[in-house]
Amino acid sequence: MLSPKRTKFRKQHRGRMRGVASKGNTIAFGQFALQAQDCGWVTARQIEASRRAMTRYIKRGGQIWIRIFPDKPVTMRPAETRMGSGKGNPEFWVAVVKPGRILFEMGGEDITEETAKEAMRLAQYKLPVKTKFISIDKNLENSSQENTKDSKKSQEEVKQ
């Protein structure tokens, strides 16, 4: 399971999850992705369970990228312990997820949209946040490349 090798401090405050994800909200590696629509904590066990479900479904077909990392320690007190006497010990690690955050990406030559959608659906069941399947639109990608080529040509014409 995922966890940091070392941290500056053993324990953290719980914090608040306000607003939407400003980083990690676009597809960077693959063609298909699973995007969070709610905020919440995703534990290292849930990330691993989702990864296994997707990997088993696609077999050796493509590649999976995990875009979140559990870097927040969650502490717990022992059962039937009286109040007070300090904060509990770190028990597990969570990743703080805000709406819009990309959780997993999938890509490869052999991966079709239907295969990716089904694999992501299996992963959705393992996660505590509401998610949606998104994909890169090929037409949109090609048009953006053409626009950059046109802008480069116009810049060259201006220089001359």
Swiss-Prot record:
GO terms for molecular function: rRNA binding; structural constituent of ribosome; tRNA binding. Signal peptide: none annotated. Gene3D superfamilies: Ribosomal protein L10e/L16. InterPro entries: Ribosomal_uL16, Ribosomal_uL16_bact-type, Ribosomal_uL16_CS, Ribosomal_uL16_dom, Ribosomal_uL16_sf. Residues 138-160 are annotated as: Disordered. Keywords: Ribonucleoprotein, Ribosomal protein, RNA-binding, rRNA-binding, tRNA-binding. One of its GO terms (cellular component) is ribosome. Residues 147-160 have a biased composition (Basic and acidic residues). GO terms for biological process: translation. CDD domains: Ribosomal_L16_L10e. Pfam families: Ribosomal_L16. Binds 23S rRNA and is also seen to make contacts with the A and possibly P site tRNAs. Part of the 50S ribosomal subunit. Belongs to the universal ribosomal protein uL16 family. This is Large ribosomal subunit protein uL16. The gene is rplP.
